[in-house]
Amino acid sequence: IYGVMIMKNFTGKILLLASMTAASAAYSVEYHEVQPKQSSIAFQYQQMGVAMDGKFKRFSSQLSFDPAQPAKAKASFDVELASIDTGSSEADAEESGKPWFNTKAFPTAQFVSTSVKALGGNRYEVAGKLTIKGRAQDVVIPATFNAQGKTGVFEGRFILRRGDYSIGEGAWSKFDIVANDVNVKFRITATGK
């Protein structure tokens, strides 16, 4: 009788563990399909003390993110710099020119992640290389992630210093008219399975 009780207890624990593992697997979603129409990459900077806003309308991406294994996450984004939208077609044309983004020579800005660190409370640090105009810089980007079933939303913001990438050459390389700090804000929506 004692042996049967031990066996039943052992079997019960195995079944409980199996059901917990199955439940965990059922709720584990890997997010990999970015939804560009539900996503945005925007920026804000100061020009002569006045806040100016803009965004990029087109980008491509590759993403692999499992909330249960964030350290294995990978992400890369290629932003079409000529898709800049400042609300002024004249300003957009100037920003695409040689002193600024020089989109004929450097059509895209690229970010490639190198590591993802979970901080708790749906907060993460995403480290990687950001390349603009052929100049690569190591960056660490704080981000949050929130899931709603098979849809996940990544949000974050960071400061880009345009001087590090020669955005604004010649007379524009000084920061008295256009500030060096550019606040980049993103919202990336992705689906998974």
Segments and roles (model prediction):
Residues 8-17:
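Sec-dependent signal peptide recognition
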Residues 27-193:
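Low-complexity, acidic/polar, glycine-enriched regions of mature
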